[in-house]
């Protein structure tokens, strides 16, 4: 079967051409190793190996070559390993059950010859052929992973394998002259083409374990680890890397991270330095910690899928725009530092623009050419004043923005808790600070150019100089500008063409002063600091500002205040007049109501007197009677006022209810036959039909009708006790038809 004999102490599995038998042996030993605590363990250290000296490495190289030749002669043929199962069998040797456990490989690391001698001592029953075959197999595996020699002719890499605290014979096959222990080893494969004819330049071998402990070479969902054999590029060697990952995707991600951040030129840097950088980058991602570290320590090589995607992204035409956009809004500090580095390396005058570039020429012009004319100097002076105003405005706007942002942060923190707004506002504040800084630098550069043209050397360093003895560059510049203006006005250096005589102050200055006046309308008295600031903003002197405010308070502010007071007094007078008119109207209305009431009472009284004096002998029709009853009902309140009068006994005072006429008519209809009867109301005070007042007592009752009784009773007045007349005193008229 191509499997060498094994002893109780050490088991060496060599797979030649049959995958089936080796998979069964792998399953057996893999199951045995799982009960012993896993295939192999890793410590938490990540140390670099100590490089041995040149003499020791040369001796070991000669020893390996000699033993390889002896094993090839003794064994007859060198066992050939297939790429599919070779690495999986390498890392599945069971621990020795006999004297092999007495070997403590973690305490001391021996050389190749010492390890092989101990191996031969632990296998006394092995014959010469088996021993030679085992030695050849051991050297074959050892040559696959040699220690890193330092001489230039050797094609070995820079990393070396180290042994671990494990009882497996894998460490016997992989000796190392170094002394320290580590985890996540990276093994390099440097076999020649005649030793491994079927070995490719880049191979990936995986060992897998399913829950039912059956080994599947291709269709398994649970992957224990990955082994990557990668080509290192121009060095001509191959690199072997180990990683503990759940799938090959994690290893591909780690390779992608390494290629993105460090590129193909990362082989020039030391692996230890790369590891430190990558460890700080992925400090919080504990899930991919082990697999990423292994992939990072491996030799740099471009993976097919990840590097293709990265190259597509890098070569895209949208990459530059996206990077600028991200640097503008996300990577604020890094972009600013990049620009500073580029400016310092390539062109130190990029920020200043034309100002920085023209400073030597302006200095040369000042030296070679005559100074500026008065008109040009005045123009540059105005420009300098405007730039100073802009600089002040930028500072004021930035302070205002910071205050507004702080208000928003405070309100958000009150609702969500302290520090809740920091992740959202910190980036915005940095971005806005960067914008304001760029704007301020541009204004400062233009101001520096103007100052250099004017010959103000002290003011040229306005953006860089600091506080000296209580004075600032702005105050010094202000003082110089005021001195120059005063000197120009006094000495008469200004030409008439450049400074035409004008009436009053400039309109821009007047607008600034007027705006300040209206902002402080309640107290238009600027302090000394306000006068200095206004003088700097308007380009005027302090005396001009003071005189303007004196005149403005007299000519503008005082008339406006007086006009406001006059308007208020007029409005008050109008309100008082309206109130008086309303009161007069109310009094007039009340008087009119009283007069109308008295007039109504008088008219009612006269009407009653006249009706009492005129006898009624005719009865109107039913409608006239109803109207008369209604008018009597309406005037009963007025008539009640005269109940105490002598004639009140003859007048009706009230009715039983509002429906009295209807009740009276119903009563008459029930008593006197309905349609044949009629009623009339008449008040008689004098004689009626030949009867005198003496014959009429109280209320006179007049009865008309065609009934057999022929009586119609009409009552005038109330039915008080003693107010009803006797039956004998009633006046009856019989046999009268309809009137």
From Swiss-Prot:
Key words of the record: DNA-binding, Homeobox, Nucleus, Transcription, Transcription regulation
Tissue specificity remark: Expressed in lateral organs.
Biased composition (Acidic residues): 576-585
InterPro entries, sorted: HD, Homeodomain-like_sf, KN_HD, POX_dom, TALE_homeobox
Transcription regulation recorded as keyword: yes
Listed Basic and acidic residues bias regions: 586-596
GO biological process: leaf morphogenesis; mucilage pectin metabolic process
Alphabetical list of PROSITE patterns matching this protein: HOMEOBOX_1, HOMEOBOX_2
Quaternary structure, from the entry: May form heterodimeric complexes with TALE/KNOX proteins STM, KNAT1/BP, KNAT2 and KNAT5. Interacts with OFP1, OFP2, OFP4 and OFP5. Interacts with KNATM, isoform KNATM-B.
Record-given protein name: BEL1-like homeodomain protein 2
UniProt organism field: Arabidopsis thaliana
Gene that this polypeptide is encoded by: BLH2
């Amino acid at each position: 079967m191509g499997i060498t004999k094994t002893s109780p102490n050490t088991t060496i599995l060599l797979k030649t051409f049959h995958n089936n038998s080796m998979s069964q042996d792998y399953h057996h030993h893999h199951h045995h190793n799982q009960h012993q605590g896993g295939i192999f363990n890793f410590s938490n250290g990540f140390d670099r190996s100590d490089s041995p000296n040149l003499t020791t490495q040369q001796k070991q190289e000669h020893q390996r070559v000699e033993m390889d030749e002896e094993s090839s002669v003794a064994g007859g043929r060198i066992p050939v390993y297939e790429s599919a199962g070779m690495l999986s069998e390498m890392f599945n040797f069971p621990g020795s059950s006999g004297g092999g456990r007495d070997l403590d490989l973690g305490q001391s690391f021996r050389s190749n010859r010492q390890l092989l001698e101990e191996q031969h001592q632990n296998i006394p029953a092995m014959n010469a052929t088996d021993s030679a075959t085992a030695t050849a197999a051991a050297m074959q595996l050892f040559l696959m992973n040699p220690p890193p020699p330092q001489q230039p002719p050797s094609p070995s890499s820079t990393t070396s394998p180290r042994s671990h605290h494990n009882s497996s014979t894998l460490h016997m096959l992989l000796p190392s002259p170094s002394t320290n222990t580590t985890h996540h080893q990276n093994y390099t494969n440097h076999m020649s083409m005649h030793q491994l004819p079927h070995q490719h330049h880049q191979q990936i071998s995986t060992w897998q374990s399913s829950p039912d402990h059956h080994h599947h070479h291709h269709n398994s969902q649970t992957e224990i680890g990955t082994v990557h054999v990668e080509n290192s590029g121009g060095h001509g060697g191959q690199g072997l890397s180990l990683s503990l990952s759940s799938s090959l995707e994690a290893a591909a991600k780690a390779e992608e991270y390494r290629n993105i951040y460090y590129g193909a030129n990362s082989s020039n840097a030391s692996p230890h330095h790369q590891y430190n950088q990558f460890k700080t980058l992925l400090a919080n991602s504990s899930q991919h910690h082990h697999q990423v570290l292994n992939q990072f320590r491996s030799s740099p090589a471009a993976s097919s899928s990840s590097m293709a995607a990265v190259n597509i992204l890098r070569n895209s035409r949208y990459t530059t725009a996206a990077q600028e956009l991200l640097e503008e809004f996300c990577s604020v500090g890094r972009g600013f530092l990049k620009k500073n580095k580029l400016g310092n390396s390539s062109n130190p005058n990029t920020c200043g623009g034309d100002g920085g570039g023209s400073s030597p020429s302006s200095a040369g012009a000042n030296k070679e050419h005559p100074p500026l004319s008065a008109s040009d100097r005045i123009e540059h002076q105005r420009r300098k004043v405007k730039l100073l105003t802009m600089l002040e405005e930028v500072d004021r706007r930035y302070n205002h923005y910071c205050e507004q942002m702080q208000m928003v942060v405070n309100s958000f923190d009150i609702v969500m808790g302290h520090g809740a707004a920091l992740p959202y506002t910190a980036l915005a504040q940095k971005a806005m600070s960067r914008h304001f800084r760029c704007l301020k630098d541009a204004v400062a550069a233009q101001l520096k150019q103007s100052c250099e043209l004017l010959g103000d050397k002290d003011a040229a360093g306005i953006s860089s100089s600091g506080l000296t003895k209580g004075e600032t560059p702005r105050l010094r510049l202000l003082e110089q500008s005021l001195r120059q203006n005063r000197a120009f006005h006094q000495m008469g250096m200004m030409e008439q063409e450049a400074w035409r005589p004008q009436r009053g102050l400039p309109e821009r200055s007047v607008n600034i002063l007027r705006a300040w006046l209206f902002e402080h309308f309640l107290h238009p008295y600027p302090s000394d600091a306000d006068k200095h600031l206004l003088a700097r903003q308007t380009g005027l002197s302090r005396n001009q500002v003071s005189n303007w405010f004196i005149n403005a308070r007299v000519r503008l502010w005082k008339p406006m205040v007086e006009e406001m007071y006059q308007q208020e007094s007029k409005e008050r007078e109008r309100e008082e007049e309206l109130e008086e008119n309303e009161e007069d109207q109310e009094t007039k209305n009340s008087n009119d109501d009283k007069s109308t009431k008295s007039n109504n009472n008088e008219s009612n009284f006269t009407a009653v007197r006249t009706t009492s004096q005129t006898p009624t002998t005719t009865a109107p029709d039913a409608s006239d009677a109803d109207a008369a009853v209604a008018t009597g009902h309406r005037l009963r309140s007025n008539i009640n006022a005269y109940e105490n009068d002598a004639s009140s006994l003859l007048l009706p005072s009230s009715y039983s209810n509002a429906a009295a006429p209807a009740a009276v008519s119903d009563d008459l209809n029930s008593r006197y036959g309905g349609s044949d009867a009629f009623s009339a109301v008449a008040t008689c005070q004098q004689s009626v039909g030949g009867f005198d007042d003496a014959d009429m007592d109280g209320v006179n009752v007049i009865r008309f009708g065609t009934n057999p009784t022929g009586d119609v009773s009409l009552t005038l007045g109330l039915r008080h006790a003693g107010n009803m007349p006797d039956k004998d005193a009633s006046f009856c008229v019989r046999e009268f038809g309809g009137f």
